[in-house]
Each structure stands twice: as C-alpha cells, then as structure tokens.
UniProtKB/Swiss-Prot annotation:
Keywords: Cell cycle, Cell division, Periplasm, Signal. PANTHER family: PROTEIN TOLB, PROTEIN TOLB HOMOLOG. Part of the Tol-Pal system, which plays a role in outer membrane invagination during cell division and is important for maintaining outer membrane integrity. It is found in: Periplasm. This is Tol-Pal system protein TolB. One of its GO terms (biological process) is cell division. Belongs to the TolB family. Pfam families: PD40, TolB_N. The keyword Membrane does not apply. Its main location: periplasm. It comes from the Bacteria. The Tol-Pal system is composed of five core proteins: the inner membrane proteins TolA, TolQ and TolR, the periplasmic protein TolB and the outer membrane protein Pal. They form a network linking the inner and outer membranes and the peptidoglycan layer. HAMAP family: TolB (MF_00671).
Length: 442
C-alpha cells in the first residue's frame, strides 16, 4: 500500500479532470503469440451498478504488456464467480489458459470499497484435481484485499496487473508508471505543451505551455521531478520541475546549447550537453550547487548523454568517427570507447535498467529504427519497422520501449517490446507528439 499511496498522491496533485485517454493505444503486432490468461469481471456485491469495471483495467494492462492475451469471457467455463471458493478446477481443463484472475468489490463505508482478488494457477489446479480433492493453497498464487476510494479504482487495477505480471513472469510490472512527452499544436497561440500521463495515456495533464519549443523531458530516479529544455526565454535553457509542488528551477543557462539533460542514478546531478566552450560537449552539473564538470573534450560534436545504472559511466552520441555513433566514457578515468559499429548511424542510446542491453536509434539504408544491442555479445537487433524513429525511452522493468515516430505524416508515439515481438502505436487526438520519457517505478 505504501507504493500505491505514493503513486495516488502524485496522481491527485496532477489530475484535475476525469480520467480519459488522450493517447489511444492501437496494438499493431504481437497479440497472437501472447500467453493465454483468464480475467473474470470482478463481482459487485453492492446495490446498483459497480463504480468501475476494475477487471477491464487489468485486461487492458495485460494485453498492452505484449506478454498475455486475455480470453473472451463468453468462452470461459464458469461465469459470475469472484472467489477461489467458487472455483471448480475440473471445469477449466479445456480452457488452455495458464492462470485465472477473479475478484469481488463491495461497499465499505462512505466512498470506500473493499476490493478482493485471487490469482489461480490453472495448470497446477488441473494437475492437482486429477489426484483428487485438494486445498486451494495448492494452486493459489496470490490473494489480497484492499480498501480504496472510488477515485482509486483505476490505479488499483494497475496495481493488480503489476502483481499478476510479476507472479507469472518473475519481472516487476510497470503499469503504475507514467510517461512524459511534448505535444505540438500549431493551431494554438502557445503550441508547445509539456504533458504527463499514465503509461497508457490516461489522465493526461499539462505541466507547462509555451509559445517557444519545449524538448527532452526526462524523469528523476524518484519520479518526483522532470528535467527538460525550454526556449521560453528565446534561448535554450534547462529546467527541473517538481511534480508535487510545481516549483521550477533553472539549472543551466549558459551561452549556446543547453540540451539533452539526463538525471544521475542518485538524482543529484544532470549529464547535459553544453557548447559554451565551443563545440557541443558532455558535462555533469550538480543540481543544487550548479557546479559543473566537463566530461568530454573533442573537436567533434558530443551530445545525448545517458547514464549506466551504476552511475560510473555515461554513453553519448559523437561524430568523432566521422558519423554519429555511440560511445562510452568512464567517469573515473575519462577513458572513451566506441560501442556501436553496425549500420550507418547509431544515436540516442540508453542502457536498460538491468545494465545488460542498450536501446538506441539505428540508421541502415537510410531508415531510422529503434534497435537493441546485447552489451555482452554485441548482437544488435532492429526492433521496429516504422519510419523516422527517434527518442527511445525504456520502461523501468526493461520490457518495453516508447519512442517517437511518424505515422500518416504526423509525429506520434509508439511502443515496442525489447524482444521486438509486440508493437503498438499511440496516436494523439490533436497536434503532434514527440520526446517521450518513461518514468521510474512510482
């Protein structure tokens, strides 16, 4: 509940309008190969209609993970069951799903509801049933109940999805996370908008509107702040904004380029690109003291820094080899090594949270696509087949990448799993959308 309460506190501060999806997720590839799972509508145990369909949130999350495919409720052998006590293992022998999610919702005081859910291992339940009557503890993977308010239904649905996903895959779910991005709508006087939304595009909220460009939003490790570049004062400047207090702090306003901020793993510093001394170079700036340290020193352009999870190295894009490629610099020694070699260009890299892979933009035969490279084997896999892909950002559990692309002549967001199997598009209703950034776990 501590994690849920923290997320809900942020959601309440940001949300001033009813939940809605400004970015509708359109799945384009990968559902057929997903793992079958059964999610029953949660049984409402109160008068009138249920406040919200919490199971719909869970089903949508599991589909969007690219890992699971919820079965059609009409084909399930049992209907209107909400507890493990009502579950009949023998009835599910021909379903083919690996797990079942079911639950109940009932009033629990003024604007309070008790939500209970069970996660059943169907394979184990059926195997045990062949041996005779067994206790539910033999196949019950998880069972929880929580009191929530009406405003918390959607968020708690995401929490259930996180639990189910982790129990079945061993990987922490990332459904209680958010994304930030920039919307550009030139029909408005101030066309540039810095936005934050739930990972699925719901609860979109505007943090800043400007007549001048906004770009490169990035999250702090605690999920409390965003750093971004603003041209509101007719020049590039880097700001850090607290999402709870809305307080903005100008961190960097040197002559020339101030760009590509990236929070250090401890949240105390930003790696940034500055051109105050000539060519664009990589620097680290202390957010509190504004003290800066130059990291690279080369006649070529160095930009787009990103941290290794251990905070001991940075990767960055450089033209020092003649074309944009990704390099690594060790902060203790200053040693620089080239990381990418395949294709014509490689740029905009970031390291996955487990430190095992790098996600970046690869240009081959003139096409810009999102790619992944295993840092041990150096094997590179192109993940996308969209066009003009840019700005990849990795989910905190390392399973998905959100990025900018072009669709039907407009800049939109898209997502791809890090194995390249699942793909989705997030078209916006109005304007163009770019510069996505996925939050840490909240």
């Amino acid at each position: 509940m501590r994690i849920l309460a923290k997320w809900l506190a942020l959601a309440v501060l940001l949300c001033t309008t009813p939940a809605k999806a400004a970015l509708d997720i359109v799945i384009t590839e990968g559902v057929d190969a997903a793992r079958p799972i059964a999610v029953m509508p949660f049984v409402w145990q109160g008068p009138g209609a249920a406040p919200q369909a919490i199971a719909d949130v869970v089903m949508s999350d599991l589909v969007r993970s690219g890992t699971f495919k919820p079965l059609d409720e009409l084909g399930l052998p049992q209907r209107n069951i909400g507890t493990v006590a009502q579950f009949q293992a023998n009835s599910w022998s021909s379903v083919g799903a690996e797990a079942l999610v079911l639950g109940t919702v009932k009033p629990y005081g003024t604007d309070q509801y008790l939500v209970s859910f069970d996660l059943i291992d169907l394979v184990k339940a059926q195997n045990q049933a062949l041996k005779g009557p067994v206790s539910a503890t033999e196949f019950l993977m998880d069972s929880r109940q929580t009191v929530i308010s009406a405003a918390q239904f959607r968020q708690y649905g995401h929490r259930i999805s996180d639990i189910v996903y982790e129990k079945l895959t061993g990987i922490r779910g990332a459904f209680l996370t958010r994304i930030s991005y920039v919307v550009v709508n030139h029909t408005q006087k101030a066309p540039y908008q810095l936005m934050v939304a739930d990972y699925d595009g719901v609860n979109e909220q505007m943090l800043l509107r400007s007549p001048e460009p906004l770009m490169s939003p990035t999250w702090s490790p605690d999920g409390r702040r965003l750093a971004y570049v603003s041209f509101e004062n007719k020049k590039a400047e880097i700001f850090v904004q607290d999402l709870y207090t809305q307080v903005r702090t100008k961190v960097s306003s040197f002559p020339g380029i101030n760009g590509a901020p990236a929070f250090s793993p401890d949240g105390k510093s930003l790696a940034i690109t500055l051109s105050k001394d000539g060519q664009p170079e990589i620097y680290i700036i202390d957010i509190a003291t504004k003290a800066i340290k130059r990291i690279t020193n080369h006649y070529a352009i160095d930009t787009e820094p990103s941290w290794y999870p251990d905070g001991k190295s940075l990767i960055f894009t450089s033209e020092r080899g003649g074309r944009p490629q990704i390099y690594r610099v060790e902060l203790s020694s200053g040693k620089v090594s080239r990381e990418t070699f395949e294709g014509e260009w490689n740029l905009g890299g970031s390291i996955t949270p487990d430190g095992r892979s790098m996600i970046f933009v690869n240009r081959t035969n003139g096409k810009f696509n999102i790619a992944r490279m295993d840092l041990s084997t150096r094997f590179m896999q192109v993940l996308t087949s969209t066009r003009l892909d840019e700005s990849p950002s990795v989910a905190p559990n390392g399973t998905m990448v959100i990025y900018g692309t072009t669709y039907q002549g407009k800049q939109v967001l898209a997502a791809v799993s890090t194995d390249g199997r699942f793909k989705a598009r997030l078209p916006a209703g109005q304007g163009e959308v770019k510069s996505p950034s996925w939050s840490p776990f909240l």
